[in-house]
């Protein structure tokens, strides 16, 4: 997907309307608890400022449900951004309207204006054309750098492009497309995908898409128990999607037909309940005790998976191996994170596909030891499923 980017256009003196993803977590006192998304937008923001553009930033934050709610104001973000850039960031009182337009027209080259939360207006998520047109009237150039919302056709990501001639990708989207696109279309082999998470149902399309591309799939997380039950094994009280047993069998057959090795755990960590102080033990998957719940991959599986990861040239990881929020069930997930870091050090391309895996690799302190951590959970999954992302399709080729 070759899209025009920030590097392809002249910015001097132009009003640049940039959609960023500043949907950051805030604590009770409205302090930002994780500023990763703000930091990741800085290269695109600095490019506009340094090239004398007049920057207007827009984002959503949380789910205010189409009503003005001060708890979801972007003002803490504007304040933090101003500190990171070491220059003033003016906070607008809304994202459309006469006052906002006056603030926009008063901007000088290199100035930054932050619009208020787009989702204070129900028209944003409804992709309302009048709202999109009003947003578009604020800028002369549109830049989308919000990969995390690229799979949604909203007014600020898709609708707006119908009213602006110049619509380009920011550096963050460019980087996402480069890494995820390379993984899917031009991967160095062996190509290993690691899929975790609780349910097969959320990963069917990804699995089927990956069967066309990868050499090996390593499966972890609670979804393994649906596969095990489908194979006739006892899984104790582990999570099983009873209505997906036939699907699990067909996925195993599909992998075989495509010559893809699909590896399931050989041992698991089990406990009687999901809690930090529940006594746990390792059991082979062929002998899971009645009443026990599988909550992580076991040491033998960790060893096997580690070896597969270290033999790979391209690795894609989406979804944890167990309940990593609880330390005693986090070993598998952190071992995978470490194996990815080690593979990267040996020259492999390693890509973390957003969501829980991104949180896990951050918790392991290894985010900067892999090639690429995707910023979009749902967006990276849909991209890996081979779906077209509306927010990206809408940009200039």
UniProtKB/Swiss-Prot annotation:
InterPro entries linked:
Phosphoglycerate_kinase, Phosphoglycerate_kinase_CS, Phosphoglycerate_kinase_N, Phosphoglycerate_kinase_sf
Which GO molecular function terms does the record list? ADP binding; ATP binding; phosphoglycerate kinase activity
Catalyzes what? Answer: (2R)-3-phosphoglycerate + ATP = (2R)-3-phospho-glyceroyl phosphate + ADP
Q: Name one Pfam family in it.
A: PGK
Binding annotation for substrate: 21-23, 37, 60-63, 119, 152
Residue ranges that the Swiss-Prot or TrEMBL entry lists as coiled coil: none
Q: Which SUPFAM superfamilies match?
A: Phosphoglycerate kinase
Where does this protein act, in terms of pathway? Carbohydrate degradation; glycolysis; pyruvate from D-glyceraldehyde 3-phosphate: step 2/5
Q: Report keywords, A-Z.
A: ATP-binding, Cytoplasm, Glycolysis, Kinase, Nucleotide-binding, Transferase
Q: Provide the family line.
A: Belongs to the phosphoglycerate kinase family.
Name by which UniProt lists this protein: Phosphoglycerate kinase
> Could you tell me the gene encoding this protein?
pgk
